């Protein structure tokens, strides 16, 4: 184990002992906010220090076995004990490295998932609908809650644009690598010659902003227009101006919501999506310089980057960032995404570990 990593773990062990002392005091609950902070920190440090204690025990076991090597009658036993201790140390060190990785502050947040049809006309809109179904089925498997925020249906089915809110533990940490261009290759239902068409959609995954004060929006910077909601094909679906369009003048970001019959609810939803888009824009601007110096294959979230191809005739899905091809497209489109998402998370962790190694 690197000296820098061991030093960090020693510091965390000392801090955990301090927390144990603080939490055992009689007046610890006098300040509930402080008490919650201490218990949260204790919960985060406990598993790390526990793993480190196991690593140190394995190191001590190896040292004890080394002393037995001089005794010929104990040599076989000692060599086996050394091998076993080193295997445990290697495994525990790998787990500790992952535990010490810097945490994305957005990982525990709910998300807004936005899917837009791109090149390919009606077929692209149909594929946007298929992608939405894929994510909704995955959310169902995770027992997450889903709320439709805004939808713009296309004439033949599917969506020109759709935004849903997904709420649940780990929503952003599991889906944040879905941002980017998704390409589909298949024979459209409207194709009479059996030719394979290529079309594309873009996906954006945005962490939900906190209710209070995280994104400051000056009401003077907003232009709010109301209009009659319309369905596919442009037909009006109610006779009141319940649909709301919010424009954030400084950034040019526009959000429309028309799914509810209540203008107030549509406005509230539009402002929530707007806050998430502004937060997302700020996040990407903040990380632009960092991305330029160290190109991250997984975590860039660049909407213009083609990240994945879905080839229906061959029944395969290829993620171009990690060169992963899975020949079980039907299951993937039905929301069975654990293998794919797990591979992306693992690759991202490997990138972070490599960058930490470069820094040492």
From Swiss-Prot:
One of its GO terms (molecular function) is translation release factor activity, codon specific. The modification N5-methylglutamine is found at residue 235. The keyword Cell wall biogenesis/degradation does not apply. It is found in: Cytoplasm. Methylated by PrmC. Methylation increases the termination efficiency of RF1. The keyword Cytoplasm applies. InterPro entries: PCRF, Pep_chain_release_fac_I, Pep_chain_release_fac_I_sf, Prokaryotic/Mito_RF, RF-1. SMART domains: PCRF (SM00937). It comes from the Bacteria. SUPFAM superfamilies: Release factor. Its main location: cytoplasm. Keywords: Cytoplasm, Methylation, Protein biosynthesis. GO terms for cellular component: cytoplasm. HAMAP family: Rel_fac_1. Belongs to the prokaryotic/mitochondrial release factor family. Peptide chain release factor 1 directs the termination of translation in response to the peptide chain termination codons UAG and UAA. This is Peptide chain release factor 1. The gene is prfA.
């Amino acid at each position: 184990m690197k000296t820098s990593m061991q030093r960090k773990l020693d510091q965390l062990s000392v801090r955990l002992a301090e927390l144990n002392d603080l939490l055992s005091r009689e007046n610890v609950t006098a300040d509930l906010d402080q008490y919650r902070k201490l218990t949260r920190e204790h919960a985060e440090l406990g598993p790390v220090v526990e793993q480190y204690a196991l690593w140190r025990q394995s190191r001590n076991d190896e040292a004890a076995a080394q002393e037995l090597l001089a005794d010929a009658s104990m040599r076989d036993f000692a060599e086996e004990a050394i091998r076993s201790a080193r295997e445990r140390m290697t495994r525990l060190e790998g787990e500790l490295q992952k535990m010490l990785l810097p945490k994305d502050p957005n990982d525990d947040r709910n998300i807004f998932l936005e899917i837009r049809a791109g090149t390919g006309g009606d077929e692209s809109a149909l594929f946007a609908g298929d992608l939405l179904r894929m994510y909704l089925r995955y959310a169902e498997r995770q027992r997450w809650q889903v709320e439709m925020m805004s939808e713009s249906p296309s004439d033949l089915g599917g969506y020109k644009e759709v935004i849903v809110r997904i709420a649940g533990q780990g929503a952003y940490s599991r889906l944040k690598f879905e941002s980017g261009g998704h390409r589909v290759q298949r024979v459209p239902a409207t194709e009479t010659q059996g030719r394979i068409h290529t079309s594309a959609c873009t996906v954006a995954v945005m962490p939900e902003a906190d209710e209070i004060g995280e994104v400051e929006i000056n009401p003077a910077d907003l232009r709010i227009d109301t209009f009659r909601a319309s369905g596919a094909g442009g037909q009006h679906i109610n006779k009141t101006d319940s649909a709301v369009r919010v424009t954030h003048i400084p950034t040019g970001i526009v959000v429309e919501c028309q799914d509810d019959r209540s203008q107030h609810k549509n406005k509230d939803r539009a402002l929530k999506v707007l806050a998430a888009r502004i937060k997302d824009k700020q996040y990407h601007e903040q990380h632009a310089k960092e991305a330029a110096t160290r190109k991250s294959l997984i975590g860039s979230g660049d909407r213009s980057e083609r990240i994945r191809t879905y080839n229906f005739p061959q029944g395969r899905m290829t993620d171009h960032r990690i060169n992963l091809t899975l020949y079980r497209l039907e299951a993937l489109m039905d929301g069975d995404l654990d293998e794919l998402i797990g591979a992306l998370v693992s690759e991202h962790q490997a990138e972070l570990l490599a960058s930490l190694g470069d820094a040492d």
